[in-house]
């Protein structure tokens, strides 16, 4: 936001110097980026009129001008500006004037004497325009000091605003903060109604609901099309970074800069029928003021007459209804639009305007009626005309309502760590335009409509801290006892999980928590998804329901770049929609791994082989061993897994994850031409650590017995081993599966499982009779429970 220092001081009388004002603005959160002094060395620059201009006899691009500078005689000035002409009023630097580093002297240019210099705005340091002489109004008093005529000296101040301070996109909004910081008051502002003279109106229809709940319009007829922007108004615009265009456009820009309310002026004679605020129809076209023809979708707000859109609401007017140098009848517009309805629409069209910048951050919903009265008064004063009544259409139920906030003394002290006197609290908040009612605990505060960023008690306390001064808050060290957090023995921390996986030659990767909906469809993961309201892009619009889609995609990108052995893992949050409508999504921490390529790094002593299910299961079991988790595996029916090489993972009877080979069809769809083995499971159940319980080491020898059973194909090793453990009890030290065989000698529908039982007692040496009894019991149970038979 750029503005004139003198303009600001006209709204808030303060004694601070320019440097003090800049320091104050920065201290209260309105960071000053640049201060450009204007007109401080124009003591010998006057208003002058060119009486005669003749071509220089020795130079085609120079003119010899006779100039009236109010000194009783004409001065001869040699000038090279393309717009130098008889009758032009422009600044003249007299001999002895200092313009920047240049001192003006009498000189000869190509043999012709020149007694001064006609100046451009850039040469005077007033503007960046160097196209020609600074053209002043024809009625500017010849001979008057230019600084006096232009209201100089002044300064152009540019501040950097945070997104929450949209109220400071106006001179008056800034004035309230300055008044509070400098113990001053903002000058009262007269926005009284202008009485209508005619009855001419345009009906207004609001058809966009909450997106456009307030719209004010006024017809003014009989405007003088030859009226020019007065120098005081043009200079305020120029010093605020806005180039004057024409009177009507300049008035709307002036109101926007002074009050913060964007406005638009239509040529009334180009409008047909009532004005409507509505959503655009897909495919509608509109020629904009910048000359572009745009095709709209149904997400834009438009201002339309009876037959067509005539403006993009909150962004830019239409070319066909613009005001021109012949406009005599005008329709002024001032409206409030919901920021969400404007946000992002300009970027769709590659369009950035001052109006859009303000509307998408928020504009005071109470301003439109005031702004249209101020603009009307300026039009009548500068261009004449006959005003009609203001048409004020609104949907009160959709207008923002100010909240009453309880501000407690104790809360101020607790948040800021200092006590602020009640008198100072009241003074600062009232200077900011807030209404206060004293209560026992403090005050009930209602913020003005322009401060829509004030919603909770802490917002008010932040304002007090800004205005009171952060530099006045004493520096204190935090107190309290320092405690060393002891790691829980019942919990395996994430760092340990990472170290375990790294020790298994896995490398950690971190992927986006957002995924492409199309990718999830390929994985057939479409239930319970959490979509983003404002995604970074269409490809990152869903919060990930699990880690594997992103992890496998990363593995695929690496495999496609000649990485022969890829071993990745990731720890991260996953998200699921809540079962109850309106409840917050659920999130949980998962761990996943995905590998492909060779099982081992290339070495001369081992034959190369590809990684398989059992390799990755070994990685998972090593991780489980770190927490003492006893995992069980059951065949899985997940659609993204290979039907014969995947399993669901259970702990204590609860499914906590999945392990297996990614389905070949899915891998092909992802452009991965190698087998991918992966697992993913919930981290919470996995890291619940079983505390070690030290037992007595047996002094007696262990005994091993090997058994082989023919069991039906559908019977899993997990079920068989569970039966063995239950049957043998405390004598069993370990049961190991050391062979699985299908083929010759084994009937179809069966498989051979060979296991080793390791038995040991702590109190005695087991005899053959003891061991034989155990083996007999094991054989009987397995044959009975699993329809198995001992293999001979």
UniProtKB/Swiss-Prot annotation:
GO terms for biological process: phenylalanyl-tRNA aminoacylation. One of its GO terms (molecular function) is tRNA binding. It holds the Pfam family B5. Mg(2+) binds at residues 453, 459, 462-463. Its main location: cytoplasm. It catalyses: tRNA(Phe) + L-phenylalanine + ATP = L-phenylalanyl-tRNA(Phe) + AMP + diphosphate + H(+). Binds 2 magnesium ions per tetramer. The keyword Nucleotide-binding applies. Residues 698-791 form the FDX-ACB domain. Keywords: Aminoacyl-tRNA synthetase, ATP-binding, Cytoplasm, Ligase, Magnesium, Metal-binding, Nucleotide-binding, Protein biosynthesis, RNA-binding, tRNA-binding. Transmembrane segments: none annotated. Belongs to the phenylalanyl-tRNA synthetase beta subunit family. Type 1 subfamily. This is Phenylalanine--tRNA ligase beta subunit. It comes from Xanthomonas oryzae pv. oryzae (strain MAFF 311018).
């Amino acid at each position: 936001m750029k503005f004139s220092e003198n303009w600001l001081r006209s709204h808030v009388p303060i004694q601070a110097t320019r440097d003090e004002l800049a320091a104050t603005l920065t201290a209260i959160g309105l960071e000053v980026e640049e201060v450009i002094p204007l007109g401080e060395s124009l003591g010998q620059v006057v208003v002058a009129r060119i009486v005669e201009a003749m071509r220089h006899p020795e130079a085609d691009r120079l003119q010899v001008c006779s100039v009236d500078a109010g000194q009783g005689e004409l001065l001869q000035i040699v000038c090279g500006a393309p717009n130098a002409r008889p009758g032009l009023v422009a600044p003249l630097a007299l001999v002895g004037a200092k313009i920047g580093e240049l001192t003006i002297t009498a000189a000869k240019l190509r043999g012709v004497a020149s007694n001064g210099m006609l100046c451009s705005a850039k040469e005077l340091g007033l503007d960046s325009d160097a196209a020609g002489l600074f053209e002043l109004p024809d009625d500017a008093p010849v001979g008057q000091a230019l600084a006096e005529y232009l209201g100089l000296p002044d300064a152009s101040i540019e501040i950097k605003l945070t997104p929450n301070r949209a109220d400071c996109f106006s001179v008056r909004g800034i004035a309230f903060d300055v008044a509070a910081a400098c113990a001053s008051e903002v000058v009262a502002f007269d926005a009284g109604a202008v009485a209508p003279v005619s009855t001419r109106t345009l009906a207004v229809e609001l058809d966009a609901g909450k997106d456009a709940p307030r719209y004010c319009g006024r017809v003014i007829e009989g405007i003088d099309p030859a009226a020019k922007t007065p120098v005081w108004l043009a200079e305020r615009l120029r010093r605020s970074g806005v180039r004057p265009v024409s009177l009507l456009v300049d008035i709307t820009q002036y109101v926007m800069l002074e009050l913060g309310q964007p406005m638009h002026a239509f040529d009334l004679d180009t409008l047909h029928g009532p004005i409507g605020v509505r959503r655009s129809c897909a495919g509608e076209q509109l020629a904009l003021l910048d000359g572009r023809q745009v095709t709209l979708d149904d997400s834009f707000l438009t201002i339309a007459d009876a037959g067509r859109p005539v403006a993009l609401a909150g962004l830019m007017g239409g070319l066909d209804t613009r005001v021109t140098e012949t406009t005599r009848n005008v329709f002024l517009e001032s409206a409030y639009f919901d920021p969400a309805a404007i946000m992002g629409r300009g970027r769709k069209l590659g369009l950035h305007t001052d109006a859009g910048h303000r509307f998408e951050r928020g504009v005071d919903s109470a301003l439109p009626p005031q702004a249209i009265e101020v603009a009307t008064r300026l039009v009548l004063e500068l261009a004449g005309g006959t005003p009609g009544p203001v048409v004020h259409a609104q949907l009160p139920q959709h207008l923002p309502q100010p909240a009453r906030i309880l501000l407690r003394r104790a809360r101020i002290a607790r948040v800021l760590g200092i006590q602020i006197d009640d008198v100072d609290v009241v003074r600062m908040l009232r200077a900011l335009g807030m209404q206060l009612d004293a209560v026992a605990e403090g005050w009930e505060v209602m913020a003005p409509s322009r401060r829509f960023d004030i919603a909770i008690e802490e917002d008010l306390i932040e304002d007090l801290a800004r205005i009171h001064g952060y530099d006045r808050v004493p520096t204190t060290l935090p107190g309290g006892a320092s405690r060393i957090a002891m790691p829980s023995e019942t919990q395996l921390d994430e760092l340990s999980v990472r170290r375990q996986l790294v020790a298994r030659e896995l490398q950690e990767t971190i992927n986006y928590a957002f995924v492409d909906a199309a990718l999830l469809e390929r994985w057939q993961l479409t239930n319970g998804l959490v979509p983003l309201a404002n995604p970074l892009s269409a490809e990152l619009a869903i919060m990930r329901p699990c880690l594997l889609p992103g992890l496998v995609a990363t593995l695929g990108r690496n495999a496609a770049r000649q990485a022969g052995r890829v071993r990745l893992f990731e720890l991260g949050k996953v998200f699921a929609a809540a079962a109850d409508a309106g409840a917050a999504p659920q999130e949980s921490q998962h761990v996943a791994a995905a590998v492909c390529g060779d099982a081992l790094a290339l070495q001369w002593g081992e034959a190369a082989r590809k990684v398989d299910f059992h390799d990755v299961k070994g990685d998972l079991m090593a991780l489980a061993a770190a927490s003492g988790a006893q995992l069980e595996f059951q065949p899985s029916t997940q659609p993204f897994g290979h039907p014969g090489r995947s399993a669901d993972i259970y702990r204590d009877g609860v499914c906590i994850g999945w392990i297996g080979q990614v389905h070949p069809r899915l891998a092909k769809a992802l452009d991965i031409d190698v087998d991918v083995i992966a697992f993913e499971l919930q981290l919470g159940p996995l890291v619940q650590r079983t505390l070690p319980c030290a037992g007595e080491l047996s002094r007696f020898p262990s005994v091993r017995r090997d058994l082989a059973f023919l069991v039906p194909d559908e019977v899993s090793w997990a079920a068989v081993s569970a039966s063995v453990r239950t049957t043998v009890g405390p004598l069993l030290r370990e049961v190991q599966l050391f062979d699985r065989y299908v083929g010759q000698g084994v009937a179809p529908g069966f498989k051979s499982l060979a296991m080793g039982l390791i038995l040991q007692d702590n109190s005695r040496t087991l005899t053959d009779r003891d061991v034989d009894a155990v083996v007999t019991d094991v054989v009987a149970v397995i044959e009975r429970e699993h329809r198995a038979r001992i293999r001979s």
